[in-house]
């Protein structure tokens, strides 16, 4: 049985790079009928926070990513938080110490700094000298007597580590490049490269799918697998995600967390769809794909090794397609209501639904509701200096609004058809047409030079509010 995992640290919001890693693990698991595990890497006790863990899970679920085993779901390989697994890790540390594959290192920070400076002066990469590698019992006793808190280092064998990466192909790294590395810090906390091996081995992980920034960690982890006699999983290192300027994706590229995209009014299915295309592409030339279509076509072997480019304009376009064409109106309205309410636009469900029907073709994110929907909710809007000057300089503007008002003032309701018929009457009787007819009505009803169709607007807001806006305009400029 194939088993994969996503193992984030709860030290902040879910970054889009990590979300893409979670997504590709999820897609692999569903395509391969494998088990998907969520594991929380919270050994950084200072930075890890419970609220970040909760938000992380919320954001994954919002995206449509579900897991089979995890802190909330349970499972046969728990606990699924590293902070709850310390006893397990120390058992394997003891095993390595007893087998001679690990040792206590008493070197001070000053000594290590001198080693680093010497390496720099000699123009070579730094690796630990191995000073404490073969201490005698007497030497150890001497250091213990000085109350020096040791770290524990892994005794790295002198060899070339070779593995076949599913995405990157053949990889060879000489262990001379990194030397004996720390597996337990002075405070007694085991480090990432050690605990990740123990967790992956005991949880039966068969495929490790993660970002290429972990590529340099892989040989260190492989030598630990070998020392403990664990089966080595297959590795797949995903390409880095860059901004449009070809630098590493960061806050200066705008919203780069799932939470920020959600708050900015992006649709979860659009985010799922877009992130799936960062480094992978279906065989067919089609970009709008349902979750089921993506799962069916996704193969980890097809992931590209060159960097993926995060194109916000394309994400907005794709989000707009979901708003305009894919979500049904009721579903879209339910998702939009928190945005309406957040902007102070209060109404009942049916009114929200009518507004969404009117504006969905002109927005790319739900955040744009603030501006696009304003004309449906705000009756007392300011007249800009431009409008004031226009009305003063062209008497026809006021005249057209007055004619239109006289045509509708006795109506008890108004529909799109009524609006079209009335404007046709005005054209016929007074000769006003095109911009000369519709522009004055628009600025009287909205205070804007362009926007939503006027026939739609009058039908949605209703006759009383149409009269109120026209009367307000006529009184202001009369």
Curated annotation (Swiss-Prot):
Its main location: cytoplasm. A motif ('HIGH' region) lies at residues 8-18. It is an enzyme of class 6 (ligase). GO terms for molecular function: ATP binding; glutamate-tRNA ligase activity; tRNA binding; zinc ion binding. Its EC number is 6.1.1.17. It is found in: Cytoplasm. CDD domains: GluRS_core (cd00808). Signal peptide: none annotated. ATP binds at residue 251. A motif ('KMSKS' region) lies at residues 248-252. GO terms for cellular component: cytosol. It catalyses: tRNA(Glu) + L-glutamate + ATP = L-glutamyl-tRNA(Glu) + AMP + diphosphate. Keywords: Aminoacyl-tRNA synthetase, ATP-binding, Cytoplasm, Ligase, Nucleotide-binding, Protein biosynthesis. Pfam families: Anticodon_2, tRNA-synt_1c. GO terms for biological process: glutamyl-tRNA aminoacylation. Monomer. Catalyzes the attachment of glutamate to tRNA(Glu) in a two-step reaction: glutamate is first activated by ATP to form Glu-AMP and then transferred to the acceptor end of tRNA(Glu). Belongs to the class-I aminoacyl-tRNA synthetase family. Glutamate--tRNA ligase type 1 subfamily. This is Glutamate--tRNA ligase. The gene is gltX.
């Amino acid at each position: 049985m194939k088993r994969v995992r996503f193992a984030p640290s709860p030290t902040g919001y879910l970054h889009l790079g990590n979300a893409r890693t979670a997504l590709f693990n999820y897609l692999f698991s569903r395509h391969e009928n494998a088990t998907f595990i969520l594991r929380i890497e919270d050994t950084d006790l200072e930075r890890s926070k419970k609220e970040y863990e909760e938000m992380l899970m919320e954001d994954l679920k919002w995206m449509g990513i579900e897991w089979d085993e995890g802190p909330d779901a349970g499972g046969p390989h728990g606990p699924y938080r590293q902070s709850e697994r310390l006893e397990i890790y120390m058992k394997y540390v003891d095993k390595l110490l007893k087998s001679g594959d690990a040792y206590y290192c008493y070197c001070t920070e000053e000594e290590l700094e001198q080693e680093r400076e010497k390496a720099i002066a000699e123009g070579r990469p730094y690796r630990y000298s191995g000073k404490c590698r073969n201490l005698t019992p007497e030497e150890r006793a001497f250091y213990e007597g000085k109350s020096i808190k040791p770290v524990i280092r892994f005794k790295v064998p002198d060899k070339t580590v070779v593995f076949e990466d599913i995405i990157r192909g053949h990889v060879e790294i000489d262990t001379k490049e990194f030397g004996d590395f720390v597996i337990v810090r002075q405070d007694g906390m085991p480090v990432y490269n050690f605990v990740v091996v123990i967790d992956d081995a005991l949880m039966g992980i068969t495929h490790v799918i993660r970002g290429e920034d972990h590529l340099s960690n892989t040989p260190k982890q492989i030598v630990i697998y070998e020392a403990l006699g664990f089966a080595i999983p297959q590795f797949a290192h995903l390409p880095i995600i860059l901004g449009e300027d070809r630098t590493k994706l960061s806050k200066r590229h705008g919203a780069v967390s799932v939470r920020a995209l959600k708050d900015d009014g992006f649709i979860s299915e659009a985010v799922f769809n877009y992130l799936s295309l960062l480094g992978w592409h279906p065989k067919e030339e089609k970009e709008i794909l349902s979750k089921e279509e993506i799962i069916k076509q996704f193969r980890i072997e097809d992931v590209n090794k060159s960097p993926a480019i995060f194109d916000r304009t394309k994400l907005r376009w794709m989000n707009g397609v979901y708003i305009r064409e894919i979500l049904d109106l009721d579903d879209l309205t339910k998702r939009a209501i928190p945005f309406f309410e957040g902007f102070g636009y209060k109404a009942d469900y049916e009114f929200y639904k009518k507004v969404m029907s009117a504006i969905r073709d002109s927005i790319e994110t739900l955040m744009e509701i603030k501006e696009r929907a304003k004309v449906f909710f705000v009756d007392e809007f300011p007249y800009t200096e431009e409008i004031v000057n226009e009305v003063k300089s062209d008497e026809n503007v006021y005249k057209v609004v007055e004619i239109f008002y006289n045509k509708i003032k006795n109506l008890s309701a108004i529909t799109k058809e009524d609006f079209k018929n009335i404007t046709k009457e005005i054209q016929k009787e007074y000769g006003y047409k095109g911009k000369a007819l519709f522009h004055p009505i628009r600025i009287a009803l909205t205070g804007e030079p362009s926007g939503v169709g006027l026939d739609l607007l009058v039908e949605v807001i209703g006759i009383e509010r149409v009269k109120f806006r026209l009367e307000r305009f006529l009184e202001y400029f009369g």
